[in-house]
Amino acid sequence: VGTITRRHIKITEVKRGPETKIEGTTLYIREGIEAEVIADQELVKDFHLEIITPDQYHTYSETIMDVQPIATKEGDAILGEGATRVLDGVVMMLTGTDEGGVQIGEFGSSEGYLDENIMWGRPGCPDKGEIFIKGNIVVQEKTNMERRGPMAAHTAFDIITQEIREVMKELDDSFIVEDEELKSIRRPGKKKVVIVKEIMGQGAMHDNFILPVEPVGILGARANVDLGNVPVCVSPLEVLDGCIHALTCIGPASKEMSRHYWREPLVLEALHDEEVDLCGVVFVGSPQINAEKYYVSRRVGHTVEMMDVDGAFVTTEGFGNNHIDFASHIEQIGMRGIPVVGLSFCAVQ
């Protein structure tokens, strides 16, 4: 029912230079771009850009806020369709504090040495050998635990990613080292299943941007908190094409980073399993207040019931009060006679 083609561009070196460009397998990032990052958002007070190579992994870092693929749509292709260009060997990494030195997401932060805090080889994490384009943002004091602080940090940091995206769009096909096809295949007659992914929606740094114009972008996206955390149905290919820009804090609670959705293992497994018919993915936010949690979980139950599925997977990320609605989603689906399995992605403490 659909195909996206990931067009891979190999990067082996990242340097600073007078302009953002790609020459051979070297990515150059424009010197002075830091000033534009700071100027873009009133709440951003300082910004520092580092290029972390594998021999520098044992470097101290403020809390890691996100790990993002660098990808862009080709031509007029929209998210979840057509061709997507992606850089291999390099990722964007956002870190940050407020002006008082308080980590963004202090109660669940991950400051420390990068090589000691990164869980290598996981879908949302950097892979060993990759170069990190690491931006450390300082936001206005005491906005680190409000929605506007983390949102400003992510929005400002995307200026750099977007400049790289624009360069990628202009490259000729000689830069493409591999074309990878991801297919969404429906299998009538097999067990029809849906994946329900509970994402954070309590506010502050527990939020997500849904369906940006560019993979893991900012422009055009809506925050699920602003949507009331109600279920949003997307295609499996939209998930794998970067339809979620994760704003969640990352620390002991192990929320899912933007890159996790780009390589979402459950979606990939279900697409490849010839015994199941994956009809779609439902994203549902986890509100702060219990009454709102049950409001939302009832919507989940009705949504899944309307799909006439043979079974459902419900996933949540990390741990905390999101397990209240996680349990309620499972209950609401199960009480309608639909077999349901719950999965939780939790950290090593």
For each of these PLM feature ranges, what is it?
Residues 287-297, 303-307, 321-349:
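Internal alpha/beta domain cores that form substrate/cofactor-binding pockets in large enzymes
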Residues 262-270, 296-305:
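Structured alpha-helical segments in the cores of large, soluble enzyme domains
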Residues 1-224:
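Long, compositionally biased, glycine/small-hydrophobic-enriched stretches that function as flexible linkers
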Residues 316-319:
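Structured, hydrophobic secondary-structure cores that serve as assembly/anchoring elements
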Residues 188-287:
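Small-residue-enriched flexible segments
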Residues 4-7, 279-280, 342-343:
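General beta-strand structural signal in soluble alpha/beta enzymes
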Residues 308-309, 313:
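Proline-aspartate-enriched helix->loop->beta-strand connector
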